[in-house]
Amino acid sequence: MARAEADLLSKEPDFVIIEFSVNDDSTEHFMETYEGLVRKVYTSKTKPAVLLVHNVFYNNGANAQLMHGRIARHYNLPAVSMQSTIYPEVVAGRIENREITPDDLHPNDAGHALVASVITYFLDKVKTEDATEQSEPDYPTPLTKNTYEKSIRHQNLSLIHISEPTRLDVIS
């Protein structure tokens, strides 16, 4: 999240996809960090459209969608779920998990193409259903303590060393 400003928001995007559902556990702490990222992006200068993507562990269906979904509903943000689209195909045996992921977590090229098709289907559906101009977003109060929204990234390379190393004298 701390890299969002330099790596994403400085590019002034008008559309952002946020996907963190597999690397996070389904806990209050990760819901709070996720909300911080969502708020940082959603309230940034360009006020981009935001789509939340919930990926999944393809061996067991686990993800943080339960907690992250609470954030999506609180901010009325659209979300797409691989747990309800791709994972059932894996469970049913119509897709072999090794065809789409080498480690049940990170998609390979075929897995990325499949995830992209789910996202594209959703975006095409939204485009068809709602071509009206959107009003300015209303930012509700945070759902969590939200201690991460204003987080920043410090790099050690920019620190200046201001003290001399100490010398330990050995006393015998």
Tell me what each language-model feature is.
Residues 2-132:
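Alpha-helical cap/lid subdomain in secreted, periplasmic
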Residues 160-171:
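Single conserved hydrophobic/aromatic residue that forms the stacking wall/gate
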